[in-house]
């Protein structure tokens, strides 16, 4: 599930949102109210239950072959997402929806590389929310390795010390 050209996505477990209103997210460092969304490149980071802690790593322009092989695995693609085993059932049973939003009111947020798209005005979806479906299949179809671990922290420590690009979401929930 990725946005079409001219769109961004907002993922939610709530299928009844008719209007997105800017707010200060409880988990953000930013104090300005925003409507939050993601572009096509960041969409896979949200193919999870909302509260699920996840560590994600992918090959970037400065990634060494040694780090890629050590963390992602030789011949295992360019990207890996990892969660703890305790979250597998939720990943398999969550009903996740994607809202398609017009790209125009949104701007990239984050330095040096944007990690989200934000709008400072209310935004109405372009249509009804779409069920994302089987999140394991989403990962497989995108060629993203999904790794299950007993403890996410050792993996995360290796990722952030490597030359891979990375993102960690909801890690405070561990």
Regions found by a protein language model. Give the residues of each.
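A broad, low-specificity signal marking well-ordered, structured residues that form hydrophobic/aromatic
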Residues: 7-9, 35-36, 96-99
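Conserved NAD+-utilizing ADP-ribose enzyme module
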Residues: 48-174
């Amino acid at each position: 599930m990725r946005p079409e050209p001219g769109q961004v996505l907002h993922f939610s477990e709530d299928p009844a949102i008719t209007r997105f209103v800017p707010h200060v997210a409880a988990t953000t460092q930013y104090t300005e109210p925003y409507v939050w969304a993601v572009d096509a490149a960041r969409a896979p980071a949200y193919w999870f239950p909302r509260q699920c802690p996840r560590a994600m790593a992918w090959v970037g322009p400065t990634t060494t072959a040694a780090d890629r092989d050590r963390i992602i695995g030789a011949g295992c693609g360019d990207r890996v997402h990892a969660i703890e085993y305790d979250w597998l059932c939720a990943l398999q049973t969550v009903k996740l929806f994607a809202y398609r939003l017009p790209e125009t009111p949104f701007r990239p947020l984050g330095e040096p590389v944007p990690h989200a798209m934000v709008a400072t005005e209310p935004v109405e979806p372009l249509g009804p929310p779409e069920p994302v479906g089987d999140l394991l299949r989403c990962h497989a179809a995108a060629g993203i390795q999904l790794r299950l671990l007993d403890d996410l922290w050792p993996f995360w420590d290796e990722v952030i010390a490597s030359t891979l690009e990375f993102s960690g979401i909801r890690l405070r929930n561990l």
